[in-house]
Amino acid sequence: MIKRLQELIDLAQKNKPTKVAVAAAAHNLVLESVQRAVSLGLIVPILVGKEEDIRAEAERIGWDLQGVEIVGTPTNKAAATAAVDLVRQGRASVLMKGYLHTDEMLRAVLAHDTGLRTDRLLSHVFVLEVPTYHKLLLITDAAINITPGITEKAAITQNAVDLAQKLGVDQVKVAALSSIETINPNIPSTVHAACLSKMAERGQIKGAIVDGPLAFDNAISATAAREKGIVSPVSGDADVVVAPDLDSGNILSKNLEYLAQARMAGIVMGASAPVVLTSRSDPPRARVYSLALASLLCADCGQ
């Protein structure tokens, strides 16, 4: 089981470099990340965006771009579309969000005839290495599905479970989060969490033990669970936490990143190819971890 994000890089370096289409690449943080991933032998990039801006930013960070393919586009929207098309054509195996808004990227990914849709729901998973936690923690969904219902949450959970299994977790422990641990019809997230737990018992969510509703404290702390009298196979040992909605998942993830010094990677599951999706403000380190994760997913799928 992978317990540290550095292990993603170590494992990915054993494979051939993955071809990555980078949408809206003309930004120093994006290019620094890509350059670092290239130097580590993780990827072969195709940079998509305004060519003159890409070259100017690359020159600023001291990257001469010799041998690097550039696909010129006039706008970020066009860059997202072109990068998706590179993946559809098989010229790249991974799509990476550069310096553009998430909704611009997702519109290209979700386009009915020209995107990367499959029969699965797309959802985002953050993989966090939190210094005070004993293993990697996956948080979903903090970037795509705004207010998912029970059906959507089941798909979101399954996507995260599948990712956890690819990281070497055999029996994935999932905490379906709410603000309290008992079912209250006035708090919909408690009902959703209880349904997810029962769905896992009935085999509708596979490969996981799901318990909920659980508040975050007793999801990640066995001591907190004992103090509240909660007996759960998940408490204190969760691999995945399913947030009630996008707002809470996003706030939780960034809270851990900025206040608990967590390191993170971000990936979109459910598309026809891995999609690296991090915040525009994330440091190069987060993007490199995400590229390593995407590379491993490609290798696992035989791409």
Where are these regions (language model features)?
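Anion-binding alpha/beta catalytic cores of soluble intermediary-metabolism enzymes, centered on
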Residues: 1-234, 239-244, 248-303
